[in-house]
Amino acid sequence: GFDWLFIDMEHGAIDIASCYNMITATSGSACSPVVRVMEPSIAFTKPVLDSGAMGVIFPMITSKETAEAAVAAVRYPPAGERGWGPFYAPMRWQKKDSIEYYKSSDDIVIISLIEHIDAINNIEEITKVKGIDVFFIAPMDLAASIGHVGDRDHPKVKEAIAKAEACIKKSHGALGGLCLSASEGNDKIQNGYQVLLMGFDLLLMEVGVKSMLDGLNR
């Protein structure tokens, strides 16, 4: 099965109550709930962490400062600025007490999206920020920021991606990316990718329905 569930609060029509229910649905499974928030701020991050998210994806990390803000929003003081609210999440993860939960919060995965030409230009500074676990290249927004909307295979987009890949591979963090097929996933693994997002809900439903109907005699 899947190792992690991508819950999208940036583009998806998902409020915090729905997010909490999705996180709770993973209880008892080996699938870790990871939530994409709207920006690297405590206001957006704290509720999803208090709901039990095991990872947070931050969009549009374009500078050292925004990367540092992402880390600060996830970590408790003194490493960060997250407020203390150990109520729902400890019960979700069966932590015996709040101190145990405080210590385990260091295991929350922080994922930085590299999805803008500004991020490419600042990639060396961004990848030096301690606390970011995964630097995830998002090609569609990146292509748009370069002026090639919808064309992730444009030479300039590929050049930008290659620059980011090379820098991330030398950093402390893992290299992540989107895959729209198993073959693309295998290619990325061969290229050093360690974290893969294997599609999304609408795509998976479309592929499943198409596969079923294509095999139907009608």
Label each region the model flagged:
Residues 1-4, 50-55, 75-76, 129-134, ...:
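Glycine-enriched alpha-helix->loop->beta-strand junction motifs that scaffold or abut catalytic
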Residues 2-21, 137-153:
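Glycine-rich, proline-tolerant flexible connector loops at the mouths of alpha/beta enzymes
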Residues 5-7, 33-37, 56-58, 110-115, ...:
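Hydrophobic faces of well-ordered beta-strands that scaffold small-molecule active sites
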Residues 8, 56, 70, 126, ...:
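Conserved, mostly hydrophobic/aromatic
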Residues 14-42, 46-50, 72-80, 102-105, ...:
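Alpha-helix-loop-beta-strand connector modules within alpha/beta enzyme cores
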Residues 41, 82-93, 108, 114-118, ...:
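C-terminal alpha-helical cap/extension of soluble enzyme domains
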Residues 43, 58-130, 144:
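Conserved anion-binding
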Residues 55-69, 82, 135-144, 193-212:
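Glycine-rich phosphate-binding active-site loops on the catalytic face of alpha/beta enzymes
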